[in-house]
Design a protein with these regions (language model features):
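Short beta-strand/turn micro-motifs composed of small residues
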Residues: 8, 48-51, 154
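Acidic active-site catalytic centers that drive phospho-/nucleotidyl reactions
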Residues: 9, 13, 32, 153
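Substrate-binding N-lobe of the ribokinase-like
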Residues: 3, 17-84, 88-93, 100-105
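Ribokinase/PfkB-type carbohydrate-kinase core domain
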Residues: 2-5, 62, 70, 92-159
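Short, glycine/acidic-enriched loop or turn micro-motifs at the edges of active sites
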Residues: 12, 16, 52, 156
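Residue-level signal for short, function-critical loop segments
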Residues: 10, 50, 126-128
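Positively charged, low-complexity intrinsically disordered leader regions
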Residues: 1-17
Length: 159
């Protein structure tokens, strides 16, 4: 059966309404799409990284509750899981502030099993980040060699 493998950032979004915390939910551009696929019963694996901290636990648990494999999620001991503060205006448009503290060694995970016609999803700034470029190229070359379908989601937003 065809499966979906995605790579991208995971972050805990803390959403504010009227300058007060309203809710907190895990997110990320590629992550959000994969969550939807997992909820539909599509076999999904996610390549990502979170800290070995309480926020990382929340993100990991959310992934498992929504049928995403966490086998390829790096739980780094140095640094902290990323957090975003999303301040909603009266029209529910968000203005974001990000807090990120990654270790020097990034995406320390094995290559996932990828077969012909599997779908490999990547996107957003995460896939263009100079700190991850070498590792991202490794994953993309690996997926291409195995004849996976490569799908790039630029995650453009209205400015």
């Amino acid at each position: 059966m065809r499966k979906v493998i995605g790579i991208g950032e995971t972050i805990l979004d803390i959403i504010f309404r009227n300058n007060r915390p309203h809710t907190a939910v895990p997110g990320g551009s590629t992550f959000n799409g994969l969550i939807s696929l997992g909820r539909l019963g599509v076999p999904v694996s996610f390549i990502s990284e979170v800290g070995n901290d309480r926020v990382g636990d929340i993100i990991r648990d959310f992934m498992m509750e929504n049928n995403l494999s966490t086998r390829y999620v790096d739980r780094f001991p140095d640094g902290k899981s990323p957090i975003s503060l999303a301040f909603l205006d009266d029209d529910s448009n968000a203005n974001y502030t990000f807090y990120k503290e990654y270790p020097k060694q990034r995406l320390d995970v094995p290559m996932p099993e990828i077969n012909e016609d599997d779908i490999f999803i990547y996107g957003s700034y995460y896939s263009l980040n100079p700190a991850l470029r070498g590792r991202m190229v490794e994953f993309l070359n690996y997926a291409r060699q195995r004849k996976a379908i490569l799908y790039y989601d630029p995650n453009f937003r209205k400015a």
